[in-house]
């Protein structure tokens, strides 16, 4: 069975939780390293989602301009 794709908002919330836990300084160095690694992975996923959305918006904007010019 395939894993359900996580939403942008859920990934962002997880990242915020990781940052908060690291900021409070109450976790061990080992846990901090694990959290940092997970945070980097989440950042990369979030960046990809944003870049994909940016690409889709660019395509829509380009199509909008073409439609306007052809009118």
Swiss-Prot record:
Coiled coil: none annotated. The keyword Flavoprotein does not apply. InterPro entries: Exonuc_VII_S, Exonuc_VII_ssu_sf. Its EC number is 3.1.11.6. It catalyses: Exonucleolytic cleavage in either 5'- to 3'- or 3'- to 5'-direction to yield nucleoside 5'-phosphates. Its main location: cytoplasm. GO terms for biological process: DNA catabolic process. GO terms for cellular component: cytosol; exodeoxyribonuclease VII complex. GO terms for molecular function: exodeoxyribonuclease VII activity. It is found in: Cytoplasm. Keywords: Cytoplasm, Exonuclease, Hydrolase, Nuclease. The keyword Cytoplasm applies. Bidirectionally degrades single-stranded DNA into large acid-insoluble oligonucleotides, which are then degraded further into small acid-soluble oligonucleotides. Belongs to the XseB family. Heterooligomer composed of large and small subunits. This is Exodeoxyribonuclease 7 small subunit. It comes from Clostridium botulinum (strain Okra / Type B1). The gene is xseB.
């Amino acid at each position: 069975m395939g894993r359900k794709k996580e939403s942008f908002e859920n990934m962002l919330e997880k990242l915020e939780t990781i940052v908060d836990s690291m900021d409070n300084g109450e976790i061990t160095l080992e846990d901090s390293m694990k959290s940092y690694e997970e945070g980097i992975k989440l950042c990369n996923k979030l960046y990809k989602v944003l870049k994909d959305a940016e690409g889709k918006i660019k395509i829509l904007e380009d199509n909008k301009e073409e439609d306007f010019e052809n009118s």
